[in-house]
């Protein structure tokens, strides 16, 4: 069974692209050419979003190695939304993309195990165990310590899956907790980075990185640099590029001499490229997927140039 981070890195190397497209759809983000085709009820809205997701996946599947699906944008539509989530995961896997579920799960004991069963492991159904969602990685909250992370790590080992543990997030208020000083003068985020590096020792793959990986925001370059210095075997999922203001030259600090070390998420700037100042005059609304593809190529080139020239 191949190590999950090796699968991800193999895809990144194959496409020469350290990018993941976030699929965080809301109805207002959809072009009218899709919205007008469906009823304005829960079922119709979810059908419209699924068409949108499919078109975006088809547009980028040969140039972007992975998608990050934020489950909150599906849960808010209830049962129809969870079917949409499952269908989107399946469609992405059918098109040979690595699937990262952004759910930020965190609890202890049997609850953590239940979360892990759903996304990484298998659920007992009578005398058999069955896979529920076909995904590769899950984001995890470490605030309750190893008790809240170990069930996920155990399933990573057994089923060849991976996790991204929150270390330093890209939101403006993240420093209220994550940058606090603790005993010895360290920031909390530094201590968590050291823990994640330790937790992942048994899951390091052929490239030297572990399937116990980390979420590190693009919007805090000094923190990103500090975390890399203490978490040398930890792969980074890096949100905050594009709409949140993260710059390629800052993100490049996460990458090693082989151009590895991170995968950079963009959600709004890719999904809604057809509305952006850069592309709105070049593409009609019906060509939204083409605009996403062009933005994906621009982002790839921007990141690769920064990584090579750092």
Q: Model segments located where?
A:
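A C-terminal functional module that forms or caps the active site or interfaces directly
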Residues: 218-265, 269-276
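Glycine-enriched alpha-helix->loop->beta-strand junction motifs that scaffold or abut catalytic
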Residues: 64, 134-136, 157-163, 208, ...
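Conserved, mostly hydrophobic/aromatic
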Residues: 21, 67, 102, 138, ...
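Conserved anion-binding
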Residues: 107-212
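Active-site-proximal loop/turn and secondary-structure-junction residues that shape catalytic pockets
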Residues: 25-27, 71-75, 105-107, 142-144, ...
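Active-site-adjacent beta->alpha loops and helix N-cap segments on the catalytic face
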Residues: 76-91, 108-114, 144-157, 219-227, ...
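Conserved N-terminal beta1-alpha1 strand-loop-helix module at the mouth
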Residues: 1-69, 74-87, 91-96, 100, ...
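C-terminal helical cap(s) of enzyme catalytic domains, especially alpha/beta-barrels
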Residues: 251-257, 272-310
């Amino acid at each position: 069974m191949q190590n999950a981070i090796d699968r991800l890195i193999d895809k990144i190397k194959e496409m020469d692209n350290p990018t993941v497209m976030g699929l965080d759809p809301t109805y207002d983000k959809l072009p009218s050419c899709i919205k007008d085709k469906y009823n304005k009820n829960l079922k119709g809205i979810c059908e419209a979003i699924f068409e949108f997701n499919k078109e975006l996946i088809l547009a980028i599947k040969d140039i972007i190695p992975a998608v990050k699906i934020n489950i909150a944008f599906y849960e808010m539509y209830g049962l129809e939304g969870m079917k949409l989530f499952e269908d989107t995961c399946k469609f992405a896997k059918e098109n040979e993309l690595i699937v990262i579920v952004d759910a930020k799960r965190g609890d202890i004991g049997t609850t953590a195990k239940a979360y892990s069963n759903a996304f990484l492991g298998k659920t007992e159904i009578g005398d058999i165990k069955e896979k529920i969602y076909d995904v590769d990685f899950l984001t995890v909250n470490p605030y309750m310590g190893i008790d809240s992370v170990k069930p996920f790590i155990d399933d990573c080992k057994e089923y060849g899956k991976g996790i991204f543990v929150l270390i330093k997030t890209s939101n403006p208020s993240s420093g209220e907790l994550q940058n606090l000083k603790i005993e010895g003068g360290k920031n909390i985020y530094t201590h968590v980075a050291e823990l994640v590096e330790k937790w992942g020792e048994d899951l390091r793959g052929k490239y030297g990185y572990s399937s116990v990986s980390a979420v590190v925001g693009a919007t805090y370059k000094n923190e990103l640099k500090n975390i890399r210095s203490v978490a040398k075997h930890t792969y980074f999922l890096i949100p905050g590029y594009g709409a949140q203001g993260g710059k390629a030259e800052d993100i490049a600090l996460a990458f090693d001499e082989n151009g590895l070390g991170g995968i950079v998420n963009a959600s709004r700037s890719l999904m809604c490229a057809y509305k952006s100042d850069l592309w709105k005059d070049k593409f009609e609304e019906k060509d939204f997927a083409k605009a996403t593809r062009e933005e994906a190529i621009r982002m790839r080139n921007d990141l690769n140039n920064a990584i090579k020239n750092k």
